[in-house]
Amino acid sequence: MRKRLLSILLLCALLTGSAAAVQLPAEDAASPAVLSAGEQITGAGIDVSQFQGVIDWDTTAQYIDFAIIRCGRGSDLTAQDDTKWAVNTAACERLGIPYGVYLYSLARTDADARSEAAHALRLLDGKHPQLPVYIDLEDSGIRDNCTKAEVLRHVTIFCETLQAAGYSVGVYANRYWWTTTLDDPTYDRWDRWLAVWAAETGYSGSYSTWQTCNTGRIPGIQANVDIDLRYGASLRADHTHDYQITEH
């Protein structure tokens, strides 16, 4: 078993002026951390796009258990592909980093949703993600122009199309979206990736992945990066560490 010989703080500056830190100590740990809600953290990772620039994945791989990589945004146009998609996924596959995928949704119509699903499928051809393919719901134009029922229908089109092609699927959104727009029980059919940039989620629903901040710093990446915690089965047998959330 390969060990990570590291001790690093992934700092997340919060809007309140404080910071949360995910600490990954050098020693192997017997058990994962348990948060107040009882969830067990079994992996710390990042989500990245072209906005992180060129990533030194050989370095970054030593500090993460997984990655979630943007494939693109909106409808199936090559101009809307993420420019770092190919290199980022190739690096994860070369280094054995478990990864998931997300597509930033702009869908306003059923036709848009079908095109976004086609966009993801085109870019997934030949790729082997171990984690879900997520539809990213954060664009304000969706809430401004679509009813809750329409959003659900668009998400269903995307997710069912990807599932039919053999992929695990999920939905990304922040806590406000989950509690106001995405509160239909149908969403329980898909993996849930929750964004709350704070030391606690304040969310009573279930979720498999928590995006804790967008201001993390990690070796191998020059820009700020989103930090994510995952719950459930361990993703990398060679990464067995205790994860602790603290405030500073």
Feature annotation, model-predicted:
Residues 1-5:
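Positively charged n-region of N-terminal signal peptides that target proteins for export
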Residues 10-15:
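Hydrophobic core
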Residues 16-26:
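C-terminal region of N-terminal signal peptides and the immediate post-cleavage residues
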Residues 24-58, 185-248:
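Functionally critical loop-and-helix segments that line ligand-binding/catalytic clefts
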Residues 31, 36-166:
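Substrate-binding cleft of extracellular glycoside hydrolase catalytic domains
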Residues 74-78, 174-177, 185:
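Peptidoglycan cell-wall recognition and remodeling modules
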Residues 121-135, 139-141, 182-207:
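Structural recognition of alpha->loop->beta junctions
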Residues 162-179:
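Aromatic-lined carbohydrate-recognition surfaces of secreted/lumenal glycan-active proteins
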